[in-house]
Amino acid sequence: MNQKTTPFEKTRPDRVRKQYKKQEEFTLYGWNSCMSAFKARPESLLRVFFSRARSAELKDVKVFCGENKLPYRQLDQESLNKVAAGVHHEGVIMVVKPRLPESAHRLIRGKMSDKGLVVVLDSIDNPHNQGAILRTCAFFGVEGLIIPGNGKASVIPSSAARMAEGGLEAVPVFTSSDLPSALRDCREQGWFVVGADPSAKETLFNAKVKFPAVVVMGNEQEGLSSRVKQKCDMVVRVPGKGSLQSLNVSVAAGIILAEIDRRRKTFKKN
């Protein structure tokens, strides 16, 4: 007896294909984020959309697309806004294969330089803050960024990639489903874990930091979670003199990384 196919069963393969397609594609927009990706990994390019004003500047990209039979198309402003789901695309959008993050264990078990520097984000979900911190990490040569996640999909949204201005291609991103355990493993490897929290008693500029170092940033509302804070060797704050008690987390990250980068240039291991 033939069994009838239900409407759900008919649509399920299409849903699965759409889900896989979504996981296998990542939309970049903004000139620096797009061109950094193209220069770093042109083989990941899938298709390109651009404005008339950007057409001449994208000559090399269009030649590459032609040679590799990849679609590219000039669009008007309204159409570009729809593809990017916003207006901050600067006239260029690239759909690429995503750089899927690896497990933090790979970073922790690997070889870290004596003056290595890693950044960990604890519950920082705002894409603008993620992107700004990623850009700062790239500027100071951070060797890895660890973010909560399971590693099965991209954890950096397109808007964060745009804010990073190419930083996504410069800084390896790793994920951990259990940040306290990852920080414990970092300490077992001899890495010095510094947490940043506005309620800390110790100030950044008085703290004695050792290397390799891990800097942990918490979200602006709650700071570091208690379990994460317990795994830090030291918790510091950026001292201020004004009426406001705290900084935007991406600004605080910039100050902290600048100070720690300054120290690691002259750090001598005992």
Segments from the language model and where they lie:
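Active-site/ligand-binding-proximal alpha/beta "capping" segment
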Residues: 194-248
